[in-house]
């Protein structure tokens, strides 16, 4: 009878993030959508095709009225930063967005605190860009002929 060939099992180390040298940053894109009702922080790769992590302010607090608060946005941003570090992302380009269209062009309360929390948690910030959709000419805005009277 012939002998069986015994294969040595080799253990390979698998990392989640890309292989980079020390001191080199791996960039992702953080898309922060801050409306008056909630704050979304959505991190993708540079092409925007693959979602790495997506957390909202509503996932962090229980009360509905607190979803858009700066505190909820800060908690969401801290979670995003820890998850990005696990995946090997060390730096982020920021795309900040308000509701836009024929609604408000001003970002909500959570935008600034989310950005600050990302920076304080050790993520390097690349470019900050405002991507709020602004219409060249749009449909009629909500409210009557004379506007909203207070």
Swiss-Prot record:
Q: Name one GO cellular component term.
A: ribosome
Q: Mind listing the GO biological process terms from this record? A: translation
Q: Quick check: keyword Ribosomal protein in the entry?
A: yes
What's one Pfam family here? Ribosomal_S11
Signal sequence span per UniProt? none
Give me the stretches of Basic residues compositional bias: 141-150
Q: Keyword Ribosomal protein: yes or no? A: yes
Q: SUPFAM superfamilies in the record, alphabetically?
A: Translational machinery components
Q: Which GO terms describe its molecular function?
A: structural constituent of ribosome
Q: Which UniProt keywords apply?
A: Ribonucleoprotein, Ribosomal protein
| Sequence segments annotated as region (Disordered) | 130-150
Family, per entry = Belongs to the universal ribosomal protein uS11 family.
**HAMAP family linked to this entry:** Ribosomal_uS11
Q: Which PANTHER family match?
A: 40S RIBOSOMAL PROTEIN S14/30S RIBOSOMAL PROTEIN S11
Quote the protein name from its UniProt record.
Small ribosomal subunit protein uS11
Q: What organism, scientifically named, is this protein from? A: Lupinus luteus (European yellow lupine)
Q: Gene that codes for this? A: RPS14
């Amino acid at each position: 009878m012939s002998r069986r060939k015994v294969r040595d099992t080799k253990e390979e180390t698998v990392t989640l993030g890309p292989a980079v040298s020390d001191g080199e940053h791996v960039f992702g894109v953080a898309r922060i959508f801050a409306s008056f009702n909630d704050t979304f922080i959505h991190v993708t790769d540079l092409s925007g095709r693959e979602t790495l992590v997506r957390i909202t302010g509503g996932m962090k607090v229980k009360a509905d009225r607190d979803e858009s608060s700066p505190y909820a946005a800060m908690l969401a941003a801290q979670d995003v930063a820890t998850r990005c570090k696990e995946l090997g992302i060390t730096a982020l380009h920021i795309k900040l967005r308000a509701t836009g269209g024929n609604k408000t062009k001003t970002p909500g309360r959570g935008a600034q605190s989310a950005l600050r929390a990302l920076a304080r948690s050790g993520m390097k910030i690349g470019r900050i860009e405002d991507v709020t959709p602004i219409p060249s000419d749009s449909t009629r805005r909500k409210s009557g002929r004379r506007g909203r009277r207070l």
